[in-house]
Amino acid sequence: MFDCIDTQMMQNALALARLGRFSTSPNPRVGCVIAHGSQIVGQGFHVKAGEPHAEVHALRQAGEMARGATAYVTLEPCSHYGRTPPCAEALIGSGVSRVVAAMTDPNPLVAGKGLAMLEAAGIRTESGLLETEARELNRGFLSRIERGRPFVRVKCAASLDGKTALADGRSYWITGEAARADVQTLRAESCAVLTGIGTVLADNPRLNVRAFPTLRQPARIVLDSKLQTPLGSHMISDDLSPTVIVTAVDDEERLKPYRAFNHIRILRSSENAAGRIDLAALLPQLAELGYGEIMVEAGATLTSAFIESGLADEIVLYQAPKILGEGRSLLTLPANPAVLTSEGEWESRSVELIGQDVKWVLRKK
């Protein structure tokens, strides 16, 4: 079905798709290679929503050389008119003879229709080449479409003994400069960075990408059930990225000062029995806003709530070679004796040394 050249061309397409990992949201990351055998005549990737898709960039580069070629694309070509014309039509018009997709597009607007349109035009189509890699690349987009909620990554940083601060609350950078720079990359890949009102009041964070230039800043989401976010905080006064204030408050007079800021969006959500934002109810709301990949950067209470509720899909833990002793713990979870005699619900995906700190990535089994 697929030979070594097919595999190499799709690997090239996936590498191209990764170039858009900081900018395509809410669209998927897609790369395309057009080739005659091992000779590449055109290639491209989707850069930003509203701009040409990967196939169009590749076809423009290939020109007349696209005729009779094979197009390798990491996601099924679209078949509908959105902010851009259908890529399937562009491929048909180019004269390519074969299209290989890493995976079909689960978006109901496409969902096999793109490949069907190509086949109806006499173009041979195949799919499933390096599908696992393609799905991993678009885990956020796929989570939003298939599960109706974002992929949730929880970022943590702690000392070797699992502490985030001293007992009196004093804290500074737990991890080193290299690890903090790596966090900037995770932020840039995310559609949004989510935190709680406790972190806003204690630290007044910006939660934006500062380490390198990027075409878009991730949105910022603050869970603030009682509407306590100070109007002078960076979340409100800094308009570098859109900010969503999630609250249960329904008093328009209290909401009015926040609505005066163009980059602020008020999202009404329900509370749970503890008087905090109901996370399970919130995630589908965030998916409706187009957020597919969310990174949680919060204190122990909110971080623990995502993990305990089963809503965290990935944990990224940065652990520093420091021992704080008595202090504030990374998590506040109830005892779970079952894990002593079982494998647990998390599995290690990677362990990496970044500077002097260890980065540990875990995924839900």
Per-region residue spans from a language model:
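Enzymes that bind and transform nitrogen-containing heteroaromatic metabolites
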Residues: 2-20, 25-27, 43, 83, ...
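Solvent-exposed, charged/polar functional surfaces in cytosolic regulatory/catalytic domains
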Residues: 16-19, 61, 140
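Proteins enriched for Cys/Gly/acidic motifs involved in redox and nucleic-acid/cofactor modification
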Residues: 22-26, 115, 129-159
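N-terminal glycine-rich anion-binding loops that anchor highly charged ligand groups
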Residues: 23-39
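Extracytoplasmic/periplasmic beta-strand context in beta-sandwich domains
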Residues: 28-32, 69, 205
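Short, compositionally biased "basic patch" segments
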Residues: 32-33, 57-62, 148-151, 155-157, ...
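Zn2+-dependent cytidine deaminase-like catalytic core
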Residues: 34-133, 219, 239, 244, ...
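Active-site beta-strand termini and strand-to-loop segments that position acidic
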Residues: 36, 146-147, 363-365
